[in-house]
């Protein structure tokens, strides 16, 4: 007890300078609440309770620091673990209606429901008496500079300087099926009709809350790392550009995409495994540009499979991949006739009023029903996926069925009919599941095999670099050097051609290094690039001179964040773009070589692990090699800062890694702009919702047939409800759709599937574009693992009255039988 008291008082004295006037009252409260004897198991819970009381007295920053420091001291005394680890997860789904999706830049692709939900997943790692590193993986197309700035602002308000832009990395999985409008530069929000505040807020709130969870879960633990090959989850979609790399370089690699997955396994000293994060290169484009349901695509699906597997692994003993099954359901051996008779007593319930918490409380994975131990967190992170497609069957012409042109990805000279095919072709949902399942299987294998424990320093370095005018030193083959410069951002003609994952429109083609007079005329109406800019980007013909377009505000970024997070011999390179396969290899190899020659004793023996976290802390499109850039396929045309962009990245990351291992301070560099106050939006708000006369919100429009009996693994059940716009309430950490199973004993309904399950789809629609009426269709594709019994489908929503008040509602279908 004396040792514990000493540590608490020492920790408190560290925080004393922040809030001297609270010292007496806070110390008294601490002594009053301190139990006479604290067990090892109870210490974390007691501290969390204590911190909650302190927050109620407006001491959030003081006592959050106190909690963190006290935990560090406890770790020193009671644990032999190398690190403190904490994981967190939070809903970032955002608006499921009316908002353009980010990724394909197709104005017709507007959200109208949910395939499954999006999440922010976080890990925090720290040494005793050291600052932590934070990594957040978000189910979004990419990280956003303005989102990152806002998250850091909030973290500083809560924790002081504990979490800053230097040690917090935020990376996107690159799904093309999430709400857009959350980036701050004009070119990325044109198709979303400007800035979408709901998308932005959902991301900022979710990222912040996932970090808060991880911080509150900080406990002694260990980290293990594992690597392995996954061969069937990605193909190179620009092989002609890859082949332009030097043959001697290509000969060093077996494949034209990176096949290695790197996985971290987090093990709590008391709770055992609590999470895993892995990095693997494949695009989030299993879902096509015709899809309108919010989805985490293949990486989000893999994360859902992994998290559900872990939560169910003790209940389910099977060699097959588990599906979502509620562990509290008991399988009664009722006859089919008995089940039908039982179901007949439960007809559809009319729509009725509900509360906001109704949806959250009924969620299958509701935190309201969790035990003391936090849920398992598994993230499938993005890396150098720039030229890697999940559509592994190849690209074919829609009209002829023949392979597309190799060099230009065209069909009869045009790009619009050339599409890549996923393994579930023509079903994009099946392709998403299959590619996700393949990543899940490999991650599970690596998770079970992970035996190399990470040990050593936790550190970080971060810098802002102006890539519009960066001096880059090139080393020639003869040993001489030349200084060149990067360019202000610009996009080439082939950018508008799109890719085989999502072709563009009009007569643009990949591999175009000339352009054409008509589109030059259109370009010049916006901004005519000057000769110096055209020479700098050569051989890219400039279609949009975005780096020099500033009205109504900047069209493209110029100042980018580069960051390295270190955990022992693992180095995470946070890059604000999509590196191609070979570009990523060159960056990793350059940093690894720099680290090996640093003289750091920790790095002298064993393997150094270097992973690239793509689309991190901001977004600046693609990064190709110099040789790939010459071909001017989509990726080269989208390399914003010219042919020497990659060399600039390598130069700056070598500097960062040198400063990191030598313990030197890095100058922060020029600060990026905060354009939040300049944002404009043309997305119309929800005015009101209505129903036909006599109907209520939540009423069933199309019910299940009477005496319906369906089979597991093959049948689909669909119910249509009177609904309202999902933008009225995003139901964050809730659900719009629910499948419930009847408990025979007490006639209660148990939630078994919700809108975060791959088998359940929530589809929302209006009869006309500006109609105040809408309906929700909930489709349940009954999985093989569903238990036989009596089921019903329930819908939750929120309706807006003419004068702004929002009323929550719910409704349920008639019961039916699953056999």
What kind of region is each of these model predictions?
Residues 2-4, 9, 27-31, 47-50, ...:
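Leucine-biased recognition of intrinsically disordered, low-complexity hydrophobic segments
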Residues 3-15, 60-77:
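Cleavable N-terminal signal peptides of Sec/SRP-targeted secreted and luminal proteins
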Residues 9, 25-26, 35, 333, ...:
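Intrinsically disordered, low-complexity proline-rich regions
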Residues 16, 27-28, 32-40:
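Short, low-complexity, intrinsically disordered N-terminal modules
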Residues 22, 33-34, 46:
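Cationic, low-complexity basic patches in intrinsically disordered or flexible, solvent-exposed regions
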Residues 38-52:
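Short, Lys/Arg-enriched N-terminal segments with co-localized hydrophobic residues
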Residues 55, 68, 73-819:
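Non-catalytic substrate/cofactor recognition surfaces at enzyme active-site rims
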């Amino acid at each position: 007890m004396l040792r514990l008291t000493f540590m608490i008082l020492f920790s408190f004295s560290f925080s004393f300078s922040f809030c001297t006037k609270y010292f007496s009252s806070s110390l008294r409260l601490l002594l009053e609440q301190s139990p006479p004897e604290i067990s090892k198991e109870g210490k974390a819970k007691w501290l969390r309770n204590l911190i909650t009381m302190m927050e109620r007295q407006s001491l959030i920053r003081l006592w959050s620091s106190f909690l963190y420091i006290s935990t560090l001291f406890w770790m020193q005394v009671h644990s032999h673990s190398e690190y403190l680890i904490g994981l967190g997860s939070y809903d970032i789904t955002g608006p499921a209606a009316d908002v353009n999706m980010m990724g394909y830049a197709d104005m017709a692709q507007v959200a109208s429901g949910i395939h499954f939900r999006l999440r922010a997943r976080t890990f925090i790692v720290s040494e005793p008496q050291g600052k932590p590193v934070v990594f957040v993986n978000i189910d979004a197309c990419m990280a956003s500079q303005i989102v990152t700035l806002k998250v850091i602002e909030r973290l500083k308000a809560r924790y002081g300087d504990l979490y800053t832009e230097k040690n917090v990395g935020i990376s996107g999985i690159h799904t093309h099926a999430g709400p857009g409008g959350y980036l701050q530069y004009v070119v990325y929000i044109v198709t979303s009709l400007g800035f979408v505040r709901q998308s932005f807020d959902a991301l900022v709130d979710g990222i912040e809350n996932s970090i808060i969870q991880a911080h509150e879960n900080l406990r002694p633990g260990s980290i293990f790392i594992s690597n392995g090959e996954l061969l069937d989850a990605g193909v190179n979609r620009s092989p002609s550009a890859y082949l332009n790399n030097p043959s001697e370089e290509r000969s060093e690699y077996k494949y034209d995409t990176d096949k290695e997955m790197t996985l971290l396994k987090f093990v709590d000293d008391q709770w055992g495994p609590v999470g895993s994060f892995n990095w693997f290169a494949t695009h989030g484009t299993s879902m096509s540009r015709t899809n309108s349901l919010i989805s985490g695509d293949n990486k989000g699906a893999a994360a859902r499979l992994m998290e559900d597997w872990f939560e169910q692994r003790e209940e389910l003993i099977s060699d097959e991949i588990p599906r979502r099954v509620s562990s509290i359901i008991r399988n009664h051996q009722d006859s089919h006739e008995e089940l039908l008779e039982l179901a007949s007593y439960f007809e559809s319930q009319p729509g009725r009023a509900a509360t906001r918490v109704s949806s959250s409380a009924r969620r299958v994975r509701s935190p309201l029903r969790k035990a003391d131990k936090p849920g398992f967190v598994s993230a499938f992170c993005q890396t150098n996926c720039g030229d890697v497609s999940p559509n592994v069957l190849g690209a074919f012409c829609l009209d002829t069925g023949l392979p597309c042109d190799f060099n230009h990805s065209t069909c009869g000279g045009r790009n619009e009919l050339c599409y890549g095919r996923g393994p579930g072709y023509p079903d994009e949902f099946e392709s998403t599941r299959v590619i996700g399942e393949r990543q899940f299987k490999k991650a599970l294998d690596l998770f079970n095999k992970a035996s190399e424990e990470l040990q050593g320093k936790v550190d970080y370095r971060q810098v802002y670099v102006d890539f519009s005018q960066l001096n880059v030193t090139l080393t020639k083959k003869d040993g001489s050097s030349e200084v060149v410069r990067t360019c202000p951002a610009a996009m080439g003609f082939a950018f508008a051609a799109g890719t085989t994952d999502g072709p563009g429109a009009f007569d643009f083609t990949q591999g175009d290094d000339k352009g054409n007079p008509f589109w030059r005329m259109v370009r010049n109406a916006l901004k005519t690039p000057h000769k110096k800019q055209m020479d700098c980007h050569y051989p890219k013909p400039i279609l949009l001179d975005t780096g020099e377009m500033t009205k109504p505000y900047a069209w493209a970024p110029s100042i980018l964040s580069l960051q390295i997070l270190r955990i022992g011999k693992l180095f995470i390179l946070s890059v604000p773009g999509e590196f191609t396969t070979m570009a990523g290899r060159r960056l990793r190899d350059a940093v690894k070589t720099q680290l090996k020659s640093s003289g750091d004793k920790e790095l002298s023996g064993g393997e150094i692990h270097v992973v690239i976290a793509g689309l991190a802390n901001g977004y600046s499109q693609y990064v190709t090699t110099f040789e790939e850039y010459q071909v001017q396929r989509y990726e080269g045309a989208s390399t914003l800062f010219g042919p020497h962009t990659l060399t600039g990245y390598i130069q700056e990351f070598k500097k960062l890694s040198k400063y990191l291992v030598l313990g030197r301070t890095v100058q922060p560099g020029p600060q990026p702009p905060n354009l939040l106050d300049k944002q404009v939006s043309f997305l119309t708000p929800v005015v009101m919702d209505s129903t036909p006369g006599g109907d209520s919100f939540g009423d069933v429009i199309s019910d299940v047939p009477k005496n319906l009996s369906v089979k597991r693994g093959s049948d689909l059940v669909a119910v249509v409800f009177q609904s309202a716009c999902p933008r009225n309430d995003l139901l964050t950490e809730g659900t719009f759709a629910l499948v419930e199973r009847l408990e025979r004993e007490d006639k209660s309904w148990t939630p078994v599937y919700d809108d975060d399950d791959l088998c359940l789809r929530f589809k929302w629609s209006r009869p006309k574009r500006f109609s105040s009426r809408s309906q929700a269709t909930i489709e349940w594709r009954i999985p093989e693992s569903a238990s036989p019994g009596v089921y019903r489908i329930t819908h939750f929503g929120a309706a807006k009255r003419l004068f702004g008040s929002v009323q929550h509602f719910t409704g349920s279908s008639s019961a039916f039988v699953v056999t």
